[in-house]
Amino acid sequence: MPKTIDRLIINSPYEEPKEHWNFNNFTQEFELEKERRSAGYVRAREGATSLDESGERIDLILVNKIRPRVKKWREEGYPGTTSVTKKLLSFWTNSEDRKDKRLFFAQIEAIETVIWYVEAPPNEKTGIEIPSDGGLFQRLCSKMATGTGKTVVMAMLISWSVLNKVTYPQDTRFSKAILIVAPGLTVKERLQVLIPDSERNYYDEFQIVPLEFREKMRQSKVKIINW
């Protein structure tokens, strides 16, 4: 097995990862594992003094419980979702229609996970408890790496909520009033692309909203502020 990696990219960005490099602490070599890496992070071991120390891996237990359920739900055709949601998911995942505007798997999985938590039948979420601070609003977080298209996912989340609310006004799971709180003026300026009527908005630029739903997006109220 190699001590260094000569082929870093081993998965397609448009498909669920199928393999990963794993560092074996005993052999001090990298091993190619034929499965997706479980969610987790690495932190320095207590008392570590060497830069060569590989650190301690901490698994994200909740994420690893949710991932297979979302995958099964996806494979079953997203049961429990509204007709609007089904159309959006089909539009986002149809690679034949999207051509050069294909979305990354990380983006699709991020939006799927939020939708699954909100729309999937209750039995799908048995045993899943997301910690809360007890406030009026439940906080959900999709952690994504730099460069994976977080702003595009925000556009997907907004369109999903707005289009469902406009279509089903009595459904309290959705809203067409969106508040985005940005850290700093630069980020606030960059997020103007999330306002549907703005020039070069992401709903058009990245083909987030199907043509049949474009007019409905005008009923949204998107406000971007600094904290």
Question: Where do the PLM segments sit?
Answer:
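RecA-like P-loop NTPase motor core of helicase/translocase proteins
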Residues: 1-227
